[in-house]
Amino acid sequence: MIVGGSDISKPSFYMKYKNFEKVGVEMENLWVFGFQALWSPIFLLFMISILISYFLIIGPYRTRFENATKVSKKQIFYFTTGIVLLYVVKGGPIDLIGHIIFSAHMFEMAVMYIAVPPLLLLGIPVWLYCYITSFKFVQIVIKFFAKPLIALFVFNGLFSFYHLPIVFDAVKQSQIAHPICLAILFFAAMMMWWPMLNPLPEYQTLSDIKKLGYMFANGILLTPACALIIFATAPLFATYTDSAAWMKAMELCVPAGTLSDLNITGPEFLHWMPVVQDQQTGGIIMKIVQEIVYGTIIGYVFFKWARREREKDKEQLQELPPYLQTK
């Protein structure tokens, strides 16, 4: 039915409902890839082993470390949340979906490199930092790669380079290059966050004001990569459009035997929006997650700095003669 030039035979809410219904049906199709591809049990065991080691170190083995004190519940929450998020995006279905839907891939990247590293760094107690940085090799690595300018340009440069179509497609289809590149990116992300969040006085290379500028610079440097994806008017990545490239990429997360038994020739069976729109959505997701996390950290640094300044003012006031102190 047409009224005033508009088709009201299928209201917009009905079409949205059908789209979500379609997503639900298509998500059920993921089970054809099997439990191993969906939940990565080996990676799950690895994450569990890290958590167990963490709780052993801060618990019964804490006395083996010099000047070790009880770890706060807030720190435990930060570290545990970081590990859980890392498994959810890298070991859970999101990783598999990210090989089929680009927006899921960008969500995975945003969480893994922007949200997880600060949580892990905030969850490590000072005395454990002291132990880790007591090794000469660690000191050399941190002093070079965690220099603010180097860390700033290395992470953002690698992230942008990784998402160049020719690089992205090559890495996504390589059993060797893919895990290596992801590991390098994660290391670069940890080094990028180090100047902001490490609690050791000897590694405080940025003042609080410079930390705010550092985060703003990070946001600016990540923008070109997001803009390239958001404003592209054609598909950029063959691994999401070309059947042969997609099948090759899927071998990275789906057992070869399972993949060969499936009657699937491309990612279209799970697409619930046009490829270009999915691509643009991915860029927007990355930018939104980045703004939320960076904004939160900027707020954290600002209020921490303001609180320290107030305490300093109180100390200076107490040093004045009584008749000069304001009541």
Explain the meaning of each model-derived region.
Residues 6-12, 255-259:
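Serine residues within intrinsically disordered or low-complexity segments
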